[in-house]
Amino acid sequence: MNPQKIAVLGPGSWGTALSQVLNDNGHEVRIWGNNPEQMAEINEKHTNTRYFKDVVLDEKIKAFDRLDLALEDVDAILFVVPTKVTRLVAKQVAEVLKHKVHILHASKGLEQGTHERISTILEEEIPAQLRGEIVVVSGPSHAEETIVRDITLISAASKDHDEAKYAQAIFSNDYFRLYTNTDVIGVETAGALKNIIAVGAGALHGLGFGDNAKAAIITRGLAEITRLGVAMGAEPLTYSGLSGVGDLIVTGTSIHSRNWRAGDALGRGEKLADIEKNMGMVIEGVSTTKAAFELAQQLGIDMPITETIYKVLYENLDAKTGILDIMRRETRAENEFINNK
């Protein structure tokens, strides 16, 4: 593939790591963010110390605080902004974009209020004549590992397989490998909903529970994710792949995961407001829990773990009490997880 001009919208940890991958592959990378000081740091010092203290970026990676300049003559746009601002940024893109491009996103969440997936938001806000089918880039990936070029395998999903193959081509190299998929709903919901389970897994650790309990929440959490995803139109098999169980394992077991760390702090008795302030980064699992709980209620899907985490986050339920409530639920067969509502 010829070198591409790619705008990466969002200078957070994952946006920065993906920018480096694309730069390593010979593409012209333009990072866009709305903090002029952060953009100046990337351009002048080739660092992004808010997220990576000891990483020096290639000087060819350029940063912009003007969206119109970042998008000038680009071949592709990669959204890596928090879910809560995706619609706003997409509207801004639609206002200044002058030509058709590939649209990809690597964000994980559901929009509060509408409960919509990221790709749906992008489809609604960016006119069809300016884009192809949206590509979702998602899977088991810690930015802290990708930025040091540790081996990472994830999925690229689009309703148009050629668009997924485009993402595969621009990203894949010796340490970063993409597999294509056409189940956009499955890949997106898996990436969003696993953050909820990661909060729960962290809470178990903070409460002092052992590996048995952590394995249980991951596997039963996967059952919940699959139930809701299938009700939304996803393929069940997707949840056994990289974007499903793979992402759930890496997010639900690692201190690199901000969602896991948030849950751990909750389990140790810290208040959510203090946790969010101390972390200084978006904890997608918190807002996604609310959206998923409301969506499950709307669709009539049984999600006891999600419901419990919702009550801990939004109704001040004691975390240990919530766990005991789950353990006291009526017993049932394990494999009722897809069709049982």
From Swiss-Prot:
Subcellular location: Cytoplasm
Recorded superkingdom: Bacteria
Catalysed reactions, as listed in the record: sn-glycerol 3-phosphate + NAD(+) = dihydroxyacetone phosphate + NADH + H(+); sn-glycerol 3-phosphate + NADP(+) = dihydroxyacetone phosphate + NADPH + H(+)
Biological or metabolic pathway of the protein: Membrane lipid metabolism; glycerophospholipid metabolism
InterPro entries assigned: 6-PGluconate_DH-like_C_sf (IPR008927), 6PGD_dom2 (IPR013328), G3P_DH_NAD-dep (IPR006168), G3P_DH_NAD-dep_C (IPR006109), G3P_DH_NAD-dep_N (IPR011128), NAD(P)-bd_dom_sf (IPR036291)
Annotated GO biological process: carbohydrate metabolic process; glycerol-3-phosphate biosynthetic process; glycerol-3-phosphate catabolic process; glycerophospholipid metabolic process; phospholipid biosynthetic process
Main location, first listed in the record: cytoplasm
Gene3D superfamilies to which the protein is assigned, alphabetical: N-(1-d-carboxylethyl)-l-norvaline Dehydrogenase, domain 2, NAD(P)-binding Rossmann-like Domain
GO molecular function terms attached to this record: glycerol-3-phosphate dehydrogenase [NAD(P)+] activity; NAD binding
UniProt entry keywords in alphabetical sequence: Cytoplasm, Lipid biosynthesis, Lipid metabolism, NAD, NADP, Nucleotide-binding, Oxidoreductase, Phospholipid biosynthesis, Phospholipid metabolism
Active site per database record: 194
Segments traversing the membrane: none
The protein's enzyme class: oxidoreductase
Positions contributing to NADPH binding: 13-14, 108, 143, 258, 282, 284
EC identifiers of the protein: 1.1.1.94
Residue pairs linked by disulfide bridges in the UniProt entry: none
GO cellular component terms given for this protein: cytosol
Positions bound to sn-glycerol 3-phosphate: 108, 139, 141, 194, 247, 257-259
Pfam families: NAD_Gly3P_dh_C, NAD_Gly3P_dh_N
Main function: Catalyzes the reduction of the glycolytic intermediate dihydroxyacetone phosphate (DHAP) to sn-glycerol 3-phosphate (G3P), the key precursor for phospholipid synthesis.
Family indicated by similarity: Belongs to the NAD-dependent glycerol-3-phosphate dehydrogenase family.
Protein name per UniProt: Glycerol-3-phosphate dehydrogenase [NAD(P)+]
The species this protein was found in: Lactococcus lactis subsp. lactis (strain IL1403) (Streptococcus lactis)
